[in-house]
Amino acid sequence: MIIYLHGFDSTSPGNHEKVLQLQFIDPDVRFISYSTLHPRHDMQHLLKEVDKAVQQGGDKHSLICGVGLGGFWAERIGFLCGIRQVIFNPNLSPEQHMQGKIDRPEEYRDIATKCVEDFREKNRDRCLVVLSRHDEVLDSQLSAELLHKYYEIVWDEQQTHKFKNLSPHLQRIKAFKTLP
């Protein structure tokens, strides 16, 4: 089973396309939607829904994927639910990047500090990071600097922030999903 979390643009038709692409790895792809506007509520909602999907799914190699803001959530929720994560162009500092887009972006800071101390150290090698060299929204070099100590970084030379085409990375994701 693969759980897919959209980014800030939850209504983008690209989300459906990504789900279809991920079905080449596993036919059981679950799209879990969340508001993007209420971080504390989103955290509770995503924890509940992902945990329920994992319990019902019966796949010992479940995986959670997210793009942009979905990458922020996939890394944390996947860690808390004990499943591997694949994050594309993750928004690692939504409290900064969401200024002016949502009412209380500072809630992201609260979530980041309250998650689990040193969670990336505890999550070491359980997350695969795919970064675009052409991300027009986030500084992918900074993301690589923050994450390379903990996770494998895969660079993409073609995609932009929304990462419309996952195809070149599907075999790598499939191999990562099936690791013991």
UniProtKB/Swiss-Prot annotation:
UniProt lineage: Bacteria, Pseudomonadati, Pseudomonadota, Gammaproteobacteria, Enterobacterales
PANTHER family (UniProt xref): ESTERASE YQIA-RELATED, UPF0227 PROTEIN YCFP
Membership in a protein family: Belongs to the UPF0227 family.
NCBIfam families associated with the record: PRK04940.1 (NF003431)
InterPro entries (alphabetical): AB_hydrolase_fold, UPF0227, UPF0227/Esterase_YqiA
HAMAP family xref list: UPF0227
Matches recorded under Gene3D superfamilies: alpha/beta hydrolase
Pfam families: UPF0227
Name the record gives this protein: UPF0227 protein Spro_1925
Species in which this protein is naturally found: Serratia proteamaculans (strain 568)
